[in-house]
């Protein structure tokens, strides 16, 4: 399997997952999330779903618990929307790149304030 196919399937999966999680998952523990990336293995057997959650650490933890509990539902919804022979195993990971970028931005702003 080419990695180009894995990238295309990952982009489509990202769109579908956002729709499923925002509109179909009814668990109140699921907070406001943004899926930043979906990385599939070349054989499309596993998908790492990178996401950010708006909220504190407790809300992040509750969101991941809710997504883990709804994994079967999400996978079946995804299967009905995407034409794949085997639906990949979903693994959720917290994406810290947004927080890291915000931290760098604050540091740069602080340096500019010190220069004035």
From Swiss-Prot:
Subunit and interaction comment: Monomer. Binds 30S ribosomal subunits, but not 50S ribosomal subunits or 70S ribosomes.
Similarity comment text for this entry: Belongs to the RbfA family.
One Pfam assignment: RBFA
Chief location of this protein within or outside the cell: cytoplasm
Described purpose of this protein according to its UniProt entry: One of several proteins that assist in the late maturation steps of the functional core of the 30S ribosomal subunit. Associates with free 30S ribosomal subunits (but not with 30S subunits that are part of 70S ribosomes or polysomes). Required for efficient processing of 16S rRNA. May interact with the 5'-terminal helix region of 16S rRNA.
InterPro entries: KH_dom-like_a/b (IPR015946), RbfA (IPR000238), RbfA_dom_sf (IPR023799), Ribosome-bd_factorA_CS (IPR020053)
Organism: Staphylococcus aureus (strain NCTC 8325 / PS 47)
Subcellular location: Cytoplasm
Descriptive protein name: Ribosome-binding factor A
One GO term of the biological process aspect: maturation of SSU-rRNA
Keywords annotated in UniProt: Cytoplasm, Ribosome biogenesis
Molecular function, one GO term: ribosomal small subunit binding
GO annotations of cellular component type: cytosol
PANTHER family documented for this protein: RIBOSOME-BINDING FACTOR A, CHLOROPLASTIC-RELATED (PTHR33515:SF1)
